[in-house]
Amino acid sequence: MDLGQFIIQNFHEFLTYTAFANATVGNLIRIAVGAFFIWLAIKKDFEPLLLVPIGLGIILGNIPFRADAGLEIGLYEDNSVLNIFYQGVRQGWYPPLIFLGIGAMTDFTALLANPKLMLIGASAQFGIFGAYMVALAMGFEPSQAAGIAIIGGADGPTAIFLSSKLSPNLMGAIAVCAYSYMALVPVIQPFIMRLLTTKKERVIKMKPGREVSQTERILFPIIGLLLTTFIVPSGLPLLGMLFFGNLLKESGKTTRLAKTAGTALNDIVVMLLGLTVGCSTQASEFLTFNTIKIFALGAMAFMIATASGVCFVKLMNLFLPESKKLNPLIGNAGVSAVPMAARISNNLGLEYDRHNFLLMHAMGPNVAGVIGSAVAAGALLGFLS
């Protein structure tokens, strides 16, 4: 073999290892989707902390390579770096750690000052159970239907936790769908809120809540943990970490731990979770008709949850005196997209009355929605395991 043939043969062999030789149309479509997510995050400011890691993860997971090369670089190849990171998703480690961070950052004062707001968070879970029934009717297995339905809670970590236990084969699609709808809260919810409320209802001013003592704030995570986990023990990994994080925050003696859980630890886990979830949406498994059905059911669940919260506030107002009526615009905050949904309530309220600040009122049902979605996930897990 002369030098020219040797170079040509080895160059041809080299080309077989490149992405150019192994790329499919599906890979290119998913890479474009990943780039679109990054564009939405940076250009349109749609939840950049979520969409940048997920978008880059989608691109990373769809860069093609020779599967028989034994390079140990793919997400699903044992001992690869990405596979090690992915175990946090697959085994369900990341969601409880994120709930720890959420608990350490969350102020439950608005909920404690006006406990009836918890009912709004509970009512928003109708979206989950409504979508579950529709998913069953569409031919999904009960375990798959549960994983899809939890998207209605607009809670990415809960969706990942439940789908990793009940429907791991759909986890990538469910996770991306859940985080996509979390990022699209400012697009989806305002239309539903305007549709279901009158101008008179939108300008209702709510009285400030009472002052909550430190003792109440300390007792809440302890009592909340006991009540929720005694009712739904299968929700312990999420609820336990949520209330643990909140106790660290409210005790006044573990400020350093609460700060670490709510900042550095939470940021690291969110980065790894977003990246690996994005990587898991590989074209060969993601571009299917089932994925389209999952996104459609997820949208339906999220819209039902939003509408349920708004309508439930209107129902509550029928039984409340004029001085204690609630603004229905806080009903959308019953989903657990914290604090995005509460910000939408506030922004829409200011649009109709620039002196009507609803943010703190909306945070009550918003944090109740976090608890509600975790309880709903625990109930589905316990029922279907």
Where are these regions (language model features)?
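Alpha-helical transmembrane segments
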Residues: 169-187, 295-305, 330-333
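Membrane-embedded hairpin module used as a gating/binding unit in multi-pass transport
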Residues: 177-253
